[in-house]
């Protein structure tokens, strides 16, 4: 996600955003609310006198419209967020229109009051876009390429070539050591690593990696490709390894929190679930981590419930708020528990 403009007075005002990934479109679904004013470039039929005489000739023109949000629908498999409502700025004011927000679309969102979790979601998505979540090492005998997976494609970080000489085994170890040294300097702590390439060199390197950097190597997996270099990087992307890693990373975080919650519930320990119990725990300042399903958050806001007051109270008490995706199993489990739960600093009774 890229923020292209931020114009706020206190909590009121406009933030312009360009969606760079499918995740960004999903984030926008929970940032934009009913009643917001959203601007974007879109296509709309331009009626004229000649068009009315020949209706089959009516063409759509590109215009910038501002619509008051009434409905939203996220089409995951079409990579599109549809925002529907009456036009307030631009041509055909008062008529209804649907904005199709896709990867690469820039939109401006104007709110009377931006909420903490919405601003935090933007910040987290923006920071995620700046650091590589996945690093690819494409390696074959004597040659290796390291690339960062960015939202806009693959950034080639370095090319490493094994020196030539008679001491082949020693040179191979030196070659592997150079790759590991570069990974130590280049790879963020939370990044996963895909080791790709033809033949068995990648397995030999992974073994060396585990021996020299076991913690970093624990986040590595291998993928077969027919070559290295940019073509090898593209093969990794086509095979879906990067998409699986990104999804599994989120699922792993949410699964871990859900396991902690269910364990505490089973022991009648430091946990609360359902709005009534969570609000009760909040009164005592006991909430350490609030878990809330994205659909519960969206539905609560649409119904005008005091859900944002709960989030604010958690943050004021130095607690953490984690929004779960109901697209994955941990989020589904949370939704079945009432959509909201909390891991507590201490047990609360009564």
Curated annotation (Swiss-Prot):
- The kind of enzyme this is, by top-level EC class, is hydrolase
Tell me where in or outside the cell this protein is found: Cytoplasm
Molecular function (GO) terms for this protein are:
endonuclease activity; metal ion binding
Query: What Pfam families would the database entry show?
Result: eRF1_1 (PF03463), eRF1_2 (PF03464), eRF1_3 (PF03465)
Q: Which gene encodes it?
A: pelA
Task: Reproduce the free-text note on domains from the UniProt record.
Answer: The N-terminal domain has the RNA-binding Sm fold. It harbors the endoribonuclease activity.
Q: Kindly state which keywords UniProt assigns to this record, in alphabetical order.
A: Cytoplasm, Endonuclease, Hydrolase, Metal-binding, Nuclease
Record protein name field: Protein pelota homolog
